Design a protein with these regions (language model features):
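Conserved serine DD-peptidase/penicillin-binding transpeptidase domain
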Residues: 32, 39-41
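Asp-box/WD-like beta-propeller blade repeats and closely related beta-sheet repeat scaffolds
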Residues: 1-34
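Beta-propeller domain segments
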Residues: 39, 46-178
């Protein structure tokens, strides 16, 4: 993750604020958003469907990370001295907060079991050991899609211009759905 400073439409400084995030050819996550708490949230993907890095709290693979804007770790993160906010993710694609500050995330499954999740601090969402359905160890998805739809970006709509007030809108990467 780079912080880029500009002046007069030119890059004047580039600073790495987080490095060593594992990547792969197909599944990388890659979403960055500032939350209502002014922290930077980063969705990282699992490097392969056979990797168990999403379950390893020392790995940055398959996680939602939470950072201060300078790349330091917030004191109130759920895992002490760690950027990990939640784990057990395969391929995070969309993030949005509702008016109450709850974080929702879309996640693409391997060929089915795409998910919409309500993210809780410090919780495990199961990948690659479990998909969609929770148990005492893993958090269940709010919604699971089979066949897969490849969910992408999401946003909450609270306006009054469309007849869809208080709705979560989701774009899909497969087909042509909204």
């Amino acid at each position: 993750i780079l912080r880029v400073s500009e002046s007069q439409n030119k890059i004047v400084e580039t600073k790495t604020i987080l490095d060593k995030i594992p990547g792969s050819t197909f599944v990388n996550g890659g979403i960055l958003k500032f939350g209502p708490d002014e922290k930077l949230y980063v969705g990282t993907g699992s490097i392969s469907d056979s990797s168990h890095g999403s379950q390893d709290l020392k790995s940055l693979e398959g996680k939602i990370l939470r950072l201060n804007d300078d790349g330091t770790i917030p004191d109130d993160n759920p895992i002490s001295d760690s950027p990990v906010f939640s784990y057990g993710h395969r391929d995070p694609k969309g993030m949005a907060w509702d008016k109450d500050g709850n974080l929702f995330m879309t996640e693409i499954g391997p060929s089915k079991n795409d998910e919409i999740n309500l993210i809780h601090a410090g919780k495990n969402y199961g990948w690659p050991e479990h998909e969609c359905i929770g148990n005492g160890k893993f958090i269940a998805a709010l919604n699971c899609y089979d066949p897969g739809i490849e969910p992408g970006g999401i946003v909450f709509y609270y306006g009054d211009k469309l007849d869809i007030k208080k709705s979560l809108l989701m774009a899909t990467l497969k087909g042509s759905h909204l």
